[in-house]
């Protein structure tokens, strides 16, 4: 039997040349969960995808995969542009969030912060052009409203805008830091409008609104 375009003769050997494409393809979901239960994020879609499953993976290591993230200005700065799409805060996080020097830009937060309560480690992350979609009536901070027994390292906020109308704790980076370590962090600019009504204690700060308990540290 002769070999045709669709057939091969029995008992004969044929040489076939073909290429295998081993290049990684970003999942449609924008994130991937590895065999250890850790989460790898590649874009805006991936961040919102993580938001939906974060309660199931509170202790996970979450990594912004810098190699695959856009560099819009060609200046070496990798950016995930959220386009001011509303972000509901991660309710609680106790793992490791590795920002890898990536900037999350145009982040519009519904309330509290990027994360509501953090007991984990957040590092090497920049938040740029942060806003709150509604007037603030409870404790809040751009990165986290509450950070306890945690580590915040090398994190920056470049521009935050908020209006506070109740006596609360508010910080440009962290609202309340309790028994946590904040190292190498900064808030470069922000506008906080105070239009308060009602009774209660208020604490506001450019970096941290309230910093308390004996082992809480702010370094550099």
How would you name each of these model-derived features?
Residues 1-26:
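Extracytoplasmic cysteine-anchoring/structural motifs
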